[in-house]
Amino acid sequence: MTQSSMTRRTLFALGAPAALVAFAACSKSSSGTSNSTTSKSVSTPDNVVSFNWPEITETELRDDTGYHLNKLVDGAPTVTLYNDYAVFECAKAELAYEKAAKDLEGTMNVTVRHHPSPNSVYARNSALAVLAAEVQGKHLAMARKLCETQEEWRRSAFENLRVKFKDYAKEIGLDVDKFDKTMDDKSIADLLYADQEHAFRDLRMVRAPEFTVNDKVLENIDFNKVLENVESSTPAEYLVKEFKKAAGLSWFVRF
């Protein structure tokens, strides 16, 4: 699905959760400067990942295809990651996908939507935290923070989860009180519900991560190639190739 004229210029001009309401149905700073490449190692009993994030700019742009990770190009195909920040594989996919977003600048619109497990309060609340940070122009910063600290907040007692997220909000430079209130705002919940409904009802997704191109699920993605050696450029290169193939683009097409 390409961008419609009705939704294609959806900067957060309205400022607060109200800006999100209009589109529910369908990192660095908010100044627009680019993120510095950062690297943080995270380990689990079976996994170690160094999150060497790419230098990409926070777009502060959302439309009915999700939150944009690269500059919107009118008429270009759209690829979307459906993510669950409580899933370790999703954290790895986020890293590869952000690198792909940078490589696809000017060729494809790269967006992300939420697909948290309906049975996990940790999954739901982490999605709400990213959405609340997005209102203050820090989608990427919060998403990256949750990926880097996943084992920490997933092991917290549920009653301490909001405290953890508020600590992260402070670390990435958010207005913590505003962040806390926004997490409980109905417009944020509505936006999350819209993502979940589209993933489950319309696309029949039962897991995360998943990818779509022009709103069609990519059935043949080899997730071993996405998730192995994710610190290297290889997974992103694989994703770029698969996304372009699904969109019917040659390797060199730019819009």
Whereabouts are the PLM-identified features?
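Short amphipathic alpha-helical surface patches that mediate protein-protein
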Residues: 16, 147-151, 184-187, 197
